[in-house]
Structures are given as C-alpha cells and as structure tokens.
Amino acid sequence: MAAPTAKVSRGWSGLALGVRIAVLRLPGLTQVRWSRYGPEYQDPQIDKEYYRKPLAQLTEEETYERELRKTQVIKAAPATKTSSVFEDPVISKFTNMMMKGGNKILARSLMTQTLEAVKRKQFEKYHAASAEEQATVERNPYTIFHQALKNCEPVIGLVPILKGGHFYQVPVPLAERRRRFLAMKWMITECREKKPRRMLMPEKLSQELLEAFCNRGPVIKRKHDMHKMAEANRALAHYRWW
C-alpha cells in the first residue's frame, strides 16, 4: 500500500509544479511581493491644476500623455492624498512621524493645535510690538514651520565605516530627504524627552518651532554639534571611497 500512496503524492506534486509554472508564465500577474498593482498601472493624478489647464495650451507631450492615460489603468488614490489647497506634504510627513500606535487622528489634532499655538503667540508678539517692529513679525504658522525645519537641517552627517577592524565616523554630505528627516526626528525627540511633565505636546512643540525659527534652541545646538564632529573627523573623509 505504500507504493500507490507515494505515486499519488508524486502525482500531486507534479500537478502543483505544473500549475505554478503556468502561473509564472501568465503575463497579467506580477511577481512583486505585497504589490496590489502590476507594472502597467499608472500613478493617479490628483492635482486639480492638471485638469484645469485648457487643451489649447497643452504641449505635444502633455497632449500625448493625457490621451494615453485614457486607455491605461490607474491606481486608486491613497486615502491620505487630497487636492485641497491646505494640503502640505511636509506637514503630512511630520504628522506621520509624530504618530504613535497608528492614532493618526490624535497626531493631526496635535499638529493643528501646534500651528494654532504658534499663530497665537506670534499675534501676541505682533500687538505688543511697536509700529516699526510689527513689520518684522512673521504671523503665518506654515511659514514659521517650514523655516524652522530648514534651520534645523544638517548639511553634513556621520556614517560609520569599517576599516581594519575599527569603525570610523566618516563625514558625508546628506541628501535633501535625509536632512529633512533628521530635522523632524530631532524636533519630535526633543519635544517628547525634554518636555515637562505637565506641559502639553502642542505647547512644547510650538516653543521649539519658534526657537528654531530664530536659530536658537536645543535642536539647532544638536545640528551644530554634528557639524563640529564632522569638522573634527574631516581627516577621515577619504574613507568614503577607499
């Protein structure tokens, strides 16, 4: 009885192998792990200005692309994307980094309260200033947020490189995406770890943003410390290539 059982098992394995080979050869399937869409799917275009542009003002390439998209399959737009005029990708990224436990509603609420606190503080400063000084007071919280992050971005970072059994901290220039990530990470870490027990997150974050906007505060100091370490290790810069 053992021989027929082995023959049946071998038959099933051969059938499964044949089905697998047939599936792999199908052109409509994609061998990308965790991918919902195949390579033939195009990214969605959610910008309203893209559709508001008259056809007479389109170039030949834009006209060809628009006609081509009529016959192509388009991916579903992410739930986090919107065509609102208030959409800011940098603030959305900061909100996602500030989120804990997947509670994005709370993270959005904290971000909204932070921007409101920044605006209230700046308006108090504006009304308390003289007529000459009022022109120099920035009251737009979005402008303050972007400038504060820009001031916190390091230009040069340190990367550990193994040479001769030892790790050396080698200074390397940072990409724009990495600089923005470090600025956001330092800002959030400073507000979480150095925040007084009875101080709310929006109050602490608004203080740090205003200090960074004026090139002051612990986050700016951390950026300068990284630059000093990179300057001290500049003799190891050639380890990037050797």
UniProtKB/Swiss-Prot annotation:
Source organism superkingdom: Eukaryota
CDD domains, sorted: uS7_Mitochondria_Mammalian
Keyword Ribonucleoprotein attached: yes
GO molecular function: mRNA binding; rRNA binding; structural constituent of ribosome
One Pfam family in the UniProt entry: Ribosomal_S7
A GO CC annotation given for this chain: mitochondrial inner membrane
Keywords for this protein: Acetylation, Mitochondrion, Ribonucleoprotein, Ribosomal protein, Transit peptide
Complexes and interactors: Component of the mitochondrial ribosome small subunit (28S) which comprises a 12S rRNA and about 30 distinct proteins.
Full protein name: Small ribosomal subunit protein uS7m
Organism: Bos taurus (Bovine)
Gene: MRPS7
